[in-house]
Amino acid sequence: EWPLDPRWPYPQSKVETERMLEKERGNYPTAVLRIAGVYDDDCQSIPLAHQIERIYERHITSKMFPGHISHGQSFLHLEDLVDAIVRVLERRRTLPETAVMLLGEPEPLTYDELQHRLGRLLHGEDWDTVRIPKMMAKTGAWLQGVTPLLEDPFIKPWMIDFADDHYALDVSRAKEWLHWEPRHSLRDTLPKMIDALRRDPVAWYRAHHLSLPAELEEKR
């Protein structure tokens, strides 16, 4: 068991919920699924949608990153998540009383590979990324957030401290207990996401709650 050390409120709430379940479950068995970032064929992932938006619109910030570009985070296709939940229900009588499992793609795309793949899919070119100091990134995010007439940025100053995080998941428990492993991969699904964007950019932006750039406003 890797020690749990949540560093901001969202994961802290998950750890507190797990502890509450263990304390209050009584004689009822529990299955705790620690799920990676979920996406589908259209995207429907907040961080991925914003990353695609930045590269699609060629924002200068799309070329900058305040962390190790060789690091990455695990994701999980929605269909693989549904499959895992169904397997939990089907095998509930054979699982341990407290079954804790990680669900996600074991080998994450690095930030650098993700950038290059999106650059090639969107513009037919590699998308080189420059690592910038965290303080510079925090200052830029803060200025964008307080400057009148500028849109409130997705990336907030407090997020910068987590840019170096790397999540490669051990899904061996799910394999053993559920006979489950992901059938999809973010690497193979990215072309589908970009195809969905190209088919109807306005609808894609609206579905992901993104502000339309001027060129798309004209197509409304």
Q: Predicted segment positions?
A:
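Active-site Tyr-X1-5-Lys
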Residues: 5-32
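Residue-level signal for the nucleotide or nucleotide-sugar donor/cofactor binding architecture
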Residues: 8, 12, 73-79, 109, ...
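NAD(P)-dependent short-chain dehydrogenase/reductase
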Residues: 24-73, 78-80, 86-87, 118
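Alpha-helical membrane-targeting segments
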Residues: 47-74, 126-166
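Generic structural signal for alpha-helix termini and adjacent loop/cap motifs
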Residues: 58, 91-94, 196-200
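Two-component system phosphotransfer/interaction surface
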Residues: 79-82, 86-90, 187-195
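Mid/C-terminal beta-alpha module of Rossmann-like enzyme folds, strongest
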Residues: 87-155, 171, 191-192, 204-208, ...
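Amphipathic terminal alpha-helices
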Residues: 169-177, 181-220
